[in-house]
């Protein structure tokens, strides 16, 4: 049986093309057939594959997630972007990372995703999903979007705003973080809700339970429509009177992990956080 690996590359980066050549050599040495993906490739067009290698930043990894969701295939990200929160390896490590992937020397980390539905006033339904976040934003910069939030079928608060972000723990370091939301450790199965520039006293970030359903209604009197964007890629229109529903999905994305480093260590590294003066380890060693 032929072993195949998906190879997704950020083509606009010259370093990505060089990294791809190195990855292809490692796959050839391991007897694994590479399947190169273009920007137009859809999941339905792909042959069966057992591995996925992504060379780029978080945006490229989100593109790869579209192709691997529901397959159970582990996804290995090699960071060629800026922060690269979803990536596991850096450019200089691409050869060793691909080798370990083909040899099965990695762990699996499952990241939850969101299911999204937009119910229009005429009864039509649009569906989407997100690994990071589903972001409802206004379509006119001069006006505010009027919404009412609902949790598990109960109204919570109505206000005017620039938008509302619904995020997974994975997405808590992305758009939700920029909007003032908390950083949430990836093993927390919460649904994070972050109002954007809300005109209300009670419009603070919320963390809902893993089984909660978030409803966002664009009030009929809202003078503008909204646009719901999933992971910055898939867009759904939300007219006044429409309703958005967000809940956790049972179809996670599987990330290949080569290092046992805890999330705290990754957070410090990715954000270059200062930890000068920490004596926790020394104090722990002093305890009886």
Model-derived features: where do they sit?
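ATP/NTP phosphate-donor binding region
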Residues: 1-51, 55, 91-107, 118-128, ...
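Proline-centered loop/turn at the N-terminus of a beta-strand
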Residues: 72-76, 192
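Catalytic core of DAGKc-family lipid kinases
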Residues: 85-162
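Short aromatic-centered micro-motifs
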Residues: 149, 171, 228
């Amino acid at each position: 049986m032929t072993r195949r690996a998906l190879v997704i590359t950020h083509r606009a980066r010259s370093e990505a093309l060089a990294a791809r050549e190195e990855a292809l050599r490692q796959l050839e040495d391991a007897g694994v057939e590479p399947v190169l993906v273009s920007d137009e490739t859809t999941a339905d067009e792909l042959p069966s594959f057992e591995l996925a290698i992504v060379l780029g930043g978080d945006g490229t990894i989100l593109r790869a997630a579209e192709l691997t969701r529901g397959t159970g295939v582990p996804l290995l990200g090699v960071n060629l972007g800026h922060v690269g929160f979803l990536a596991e390896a850096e450019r200089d490590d691409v050869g060793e990372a691909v080798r370990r992937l083909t040899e099965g020397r990695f762990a699996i980390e499952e990241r939850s995703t969101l299911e999204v539905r937009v119910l229009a006033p005429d009864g039509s339904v649009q569906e989407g999903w997100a690994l990071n976040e589903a972001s409802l934003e206004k379509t006119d910069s001069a006006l505010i979007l009027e919404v009412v939030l609902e949790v598990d079928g109960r109204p919570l608060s109505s206000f005017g705003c620039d938008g509302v972000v619904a995020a997974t723990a994975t997405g808590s370091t992305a758009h939700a973080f920029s909007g003032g939301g908390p950083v949430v450790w990836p093993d927390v199965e919460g649904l994070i809700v972050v109002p954007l520039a809300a005109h209300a006293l009670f419009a603070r970030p919320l963390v809902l339970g893993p089984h909660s359903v978030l409803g966002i209604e664009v009030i009929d009197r809202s003078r503008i429509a909204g646009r719901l964007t999933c992971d910055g890629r898939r867009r759904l229109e939300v007219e006044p009177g429409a309703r958005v529903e967000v809940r956790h999905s049972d179809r996670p994305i599987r990330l290949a992990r080569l290092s046992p480093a805890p999330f705290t260590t990754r957070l410090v590294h990715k954000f270059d956080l200062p930890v000068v003066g920490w004596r926790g380890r020394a104090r722990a060693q002093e305890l009886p």
